[in-house]
């Protein structure tokens, strides 16, 4: 095998989308025992990649500085001392999985614990953008949000047309089937910033209701609209990607004993001035943040197992739809980043390696 591979890099270490380029002299990773070297076919594009490109979300320095949190591909080499005879994996297997980084490259090392066999029903393009998206949604709903049919009768996803929320809305609609199959499905709501995205959320994803945030520039009154379409009731679980300016209105929309899972700050991390935090007490509210990339291998492996057992079958049989908005050749990865930055997508953007 050649000594070098091609990988996406950033001129001067950080910069805008236009600074991305293909570095043809990137060393191929050395594969260790317990790992597989994967020849990458496709990778998903995520907000974390954009933050890393901007120098605001560093990679795991002792592993790789290459962007890319999810991939699909083919096993090229087994780790040292690993053989197909004593291993479930073999060279040529089609796989996909979650990464700490490194997916924007021709080859990537992956811990075997995080590998998932690609079903024949899924293309490399579909599989390449699955894990970061669906694992994040699963984590928010089940691991942190602690969904139960008894205590979670309503769920709200902010940024409802984002890839994670698209997955999360679908998971929420069917969450009772995992927890308590005889219980009614929860009511699922979302917010978005364009009317066509709200229509997509309701018509294509089947949400109970969606609110156009562009009609609520005060960043507060949307909460009243959500409660109105929820028959006057508050929301039990809110998953938020918008950030600081929405803390108070998230408290407004919560039901008693409601939870907020904070996964991002698209509108910035700073709260509005004079935020009223009384809702923390009066509603017994809980707010918890999370960042999937910083989680341990053991934690991520639990998500992997949950996905393989309870989500992947639904992606194969059609219960869940993995919405791929755009497939872009990787030498135009800058265009893929710009699509996300300009909020032009309803679903996932995936790059394919030629």
What do these predicted regions represent?
Residues 3, 317-326, 334-354:
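C-terminal capping/lid region of NAD(P)-dependent oxidoreductase domains
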Residues 27-44, 56-102, 122:
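Glycine-rich beta-strand-centered segment in the early N-terminal region that forms part
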Residues 51, 69, 84, 94-160:
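NAD(P)H dinucleotide-binding glycine-rich loop of Rossmann-like/cofactor-binding domains
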Residues 86-89, 149, 254:
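Short, well-ordered loop/turn sites that connect or cap secondary structure elements
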Residues 96, 236-239, 261:
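N-terminal Rossmann-like NAD(P) cofactor-binding module of classical short-chain dehydrogenase/reductase
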Residues 128-216:
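Mid-domain Rossmann-like dinucleotide-binding core that forms the NAD(H)/NADP(H) cofactor-binding site
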Residues 201, 245-319, 352-354:
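Glycine-rich phosphate-binding loop and adjacent beta-alpha segment
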Residues 218-232:
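Short amphipathic alpha-helix with an adjacent loop that forms part of the alpha/beta core around
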């Amino acid at each position: 095998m050649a000594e070098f591979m091609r990988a996406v890099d950033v001129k001067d270490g950080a910069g805008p989308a236009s600074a991305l380029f293909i570095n043809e002299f990137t060393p191929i990773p050395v594969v260790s025992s317990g790992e597989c070297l994967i020849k990458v076919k496709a990778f998903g594009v995520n907000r974390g990649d954009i933050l890393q490109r901007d120098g605001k979300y560093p990679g795991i320095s002792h592993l790789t500085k290459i962007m890319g949190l999810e991939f699909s591909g083919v096993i090229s080499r087994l780790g040292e001392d690993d053989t197909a005879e004593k291993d479930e994996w073999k060279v040529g297997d089609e796989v996909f999985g979650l990464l700490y980084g490194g997916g924007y490259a021709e080859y990537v090392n992956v811990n075997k614990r995080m590998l998932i066999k690609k079903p024949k029903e899924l293309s490399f393009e579909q599989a390449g953008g699955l894990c970061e998206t669906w694992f994040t949604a699963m984590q928010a709903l089940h691991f942190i949000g602690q969904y139960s049919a008894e205590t979670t009768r309503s769920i709200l996803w902010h940024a409802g047309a984002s890839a994670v929320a698209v997955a999360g809305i679908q998971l929420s609609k069917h969450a009772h089937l995992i927890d308590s199959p005889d219980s009614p499905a929860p009511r699922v709501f979302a917010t978005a910033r364009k009317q066509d995205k709200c229509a997509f959320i309701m018509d294509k994803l089947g949400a109970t209701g969606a609110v156009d945030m562009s009609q609520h520039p005060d960043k507060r009154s949307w909460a009243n609209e959500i409660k109105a379409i929820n028959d006057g009731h508050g929301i039990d679980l809110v998953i938020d990607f918008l950030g600081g300016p929405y803390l108070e209105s998230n408290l407004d929309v919560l039901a008693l004993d409601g939870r907020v899972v904070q996964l991002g700050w698209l509108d910035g991390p700073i709260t509005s001035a004079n935020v009223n935090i009384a809702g923390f007490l009066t509603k017994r509210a809980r707010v918890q943040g999370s960042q999937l990339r910083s989680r341990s291998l053991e934690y991520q492996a639990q998500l992997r197992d949950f996905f393989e057992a309870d989500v992947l079958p639904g992606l194969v049989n059609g219960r869940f739809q993995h919405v791929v908005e755009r497939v872009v050749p990787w030498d135009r990865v800058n265009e893929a980043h710009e699509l996300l930055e300009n909020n032009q997508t309803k679903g996932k953007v995936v790059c394919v390696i030629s």
